[in-house]
Amino acid sequence: MYGLVVCLFGMIFGLIQYQGINKLPVHAAMKEISDLIYETCKTYLITQGKFIIILWALVAAIIVAYFGGLNHLAPDKVVFILACSLLGIAGSYTVAWFGMRINTFANSRTAFASLGGKPFPTYAIPLRAGMSIGMLLISIELFAMLCILLFIPVDYAGPCFIGFAIGESLGASVLRIAGGIFTKIADIGSDLMKIVFKIKEDDARNPGVIADCTGDNAGDSVGPTADGFETYGVTGVALISFILLAIKDPSIQVSLLVWIFAMRLVMIVASAVSYWVNDALAKMKYGNADEMNFEKPLITLVWLTSIVSIVLTYIASYMLIAQLGDGTMWWKLASIITCGTIAGALIPELVDRFTSTECAFVRNVVQCSKEGGAALNILSGLVAGNFSAYWMGLAIIVLMGAAFGFSTLGLDVMMLAPSVFAFGLVAFGFLSMGPVTIAVDSYGPVTDNAQSVYELSLIETLPNISNSIESEFGFKPDFENAKRYLEANDGAGNTFKATAKPVLIGTAVVGSTTMIFSIIMILTGGLADTGAIAKLSILWPPFLLGLLMGGAVIYWFTGASMNAVTTGAYYAVAFIKKNIKLDGVTKASTEDSKKVVEICTRFAQKGMINLFLTIFFSTLAFACLESYLFIGYLISIALFGLYQAIFMANAGGAWDNAKKVVETELHAKGTELHDASVVGDTVGDPFKDTSSVALNPIIKFTTLFGLLAIELAIKLPTTISVSLAVVFFLLSLVFVHRSFFSMRIAVDKD
């Protein structure tokens, strides 16, 4: 029950921050723009909600077949599992809506705060909004899981956890993928106008700008928030499944389950304490400063939270499991989680080395662009992405290796496959400062939108605006410094938007090993069947074929998601070029802006259908075809997906901040150098915000859904199973074909 109290504390913390941001001062012109962005986002999110329910019907059919037909659960219990899956969807959807709402409050308040002549409020408001999202997200997710654990009978809680996690994963997959497509169609459509018409960023006359602002929330707020909610849920379910399958002693099971949930409560406390301490330190240092490095206090917050979290992990472990095993298990398990916590702090630091405006790789992109234009800009960005994948992969390997080392110190007495449990705890440790990870990720869309709100409000052109602001709000606005603060803060936002992506994809990959182990336990009779275990090898051809197939699907997924962006952007650009009016108007018409939003929504929906249904039918096909082929497929998706996602996310981040350097430091807007940087940023848009980020929920959904699919498949007669595999595979090919040809741009005849 203490856990529920801590969850309520986290929710109250988030809601208090929400109310506080809503009450911050804001000029009417800026509030009008942020309200318009919110209304557009609301329409988009309602559309996606209807779409999620349609896809849920497909998943629900498999849940009914598995729990009702295969396991012969009573109808009322099957209905309750379905209700838990809907609860998972509702959780993802609710926190996504909350994140979108508070960010659309924060963007206009940040834009207005920049006029005060001091940079600190421009930093503090986006972070405050992010902490509100992070604390509420983790608290709601944990509250739901604690309710299942505490109030559902033990023999029935497992299926409810599975249903809840599948619902979370479905909601996150749709919102993350569709949001990623939407935002980059809008972003590219808006950005390319800077080259075509030589207009400034966020020019109010550009009909694509409102869609771009909507996309910042749909792709960089709604998607990541739902993704974060799902990540914490699925990682927890994977560990719960392992404990129930690999540990035979009920008393040890109970001790470890209590400990796991206590560690999740620790992350809430650690994040809240660290935020308050960091806020006080940042205020002392920068509160009255005229200049500040916006990245510095964010980096401090990440490391401070990791240190507090590690200390509390050891303290809580000693208090809860000091008597477990030989009396040393508490520090061994705490040390394994600490490996993940260090990874959660180290990965953002590594991301900073490849995407920050100050880093050597971004400076290399800028320098290459000066002589080689867009061609060398793109090549040097690819270099940054590839190098980042190496170093982040190495960091993850070293820390997983350390966790494996701890797992050899006697854990095998308590459980089967202790190394798998260790890897699951590493994934858990990745998330040990969850609210802060979400907060620094949410920082980016607010800073991006704040810049747009400032420009779209046309506040500098309003009659007698300086005197009006001084009269109403009590200060003289500083327009020049305001723009400079917003641009510099956006650079920090770009960097920290990039930091959460590898953390989340890392948890998907490391955590998926735990879920794959659950499938292996089913196939090998609890690791007792040596003949079955021998098939987990490249000496068993189906396993090798599965490894090859997983890589193929990852590369198709990358191409199909980018194609959805490319096609949508083509039509958005064509519409904007045809309808933009630059003479005699101060802003684009509402009708034209809505039309661009409509184009983005249409292609996001079409792309999402093809992507999700291909993954859905492929999972069923390979599970039905051959069990060990399916294991190879899952492993391959995780490994290929990890490096593809890291490479794409950081290459995109490097291109984005190279453009920021050209604009804010070199003041080269409107030059050939700027054009080259815009081209690079355009290529990077779907890299970092569509394909890479969508791989995280897809890996988790495939693994989690695969757990049901494989159990269904192995209990079917071989003839029926293979026949279904053929049918499902052909259906997947239909949507693979549609992912290009149904969205192909018509070729001009001339």
Swiss-Prot record:
Transmembrane parts of this sequence: 1-21, 51-71, 78-98, 133-153, 161-181, 227-247, 257-277, 301-321, 327-347, 391-411, 420-440, 503-523, 538-558, 607-627, 629-649, 694-714, 716-736
Return the similarity comment: Belongs to the H(+)-translocating pyrophosphatase (TC 3.A.10) family. K(+)-insensitive subfamily.
- Going by the entry's taxonomy, the superkingdom of the source organism is recorded as Bacteria
Tell me the enzyme class: translocase
Where Mg(2+) 1 is bound, by residue? D187, D191
Cellular component GO terms, alphabetically?
plasma membrane
Q: What does this protein do?
A: Proton pump that utilizes the energy of pyrophosphate hydrolysis as the driving force for proton movement across the membrane. Generates a proton motive force.
What positions does the entry give for Mg(2+) 2 binding?
D216, D448
Name the major location: membrane
Residues reported in the UniProt entry to bind substrate? K184, K688
Specify the protein name.
K(+)-insensitive pyrophosphate-energized proton pump
**Site feature Important for ion transport, where:** R176, D220, D227, D689, K700
- This chain's source organism reads Chlorobaculum tepidum (strain ATCC 49652 / DSM 12025 / NBRC 103806 / TLS)
Q: What is its EC number?
A: 7.1.3.1
**Swiss-Prot/TrEMBL cofactor(s):** Mg(2+)
Its membrane topology: Multi-pass membrane protein
Pfam families linked to this entry: H_PPase
> Is-annotated flag, keyword Ligase?
no
At which residues is there a site annotated Determinant of potassium independence?
K497
Arranged from A to Z, the UniProt key words for this protein are: Calcium, Cell inner membrane, Cell membrane, Hydrogen ion transport, Ion transport, Magnesium, Membrane, Metal-binding, Translocase, Transmembrane, Transmembrane helix, Transport
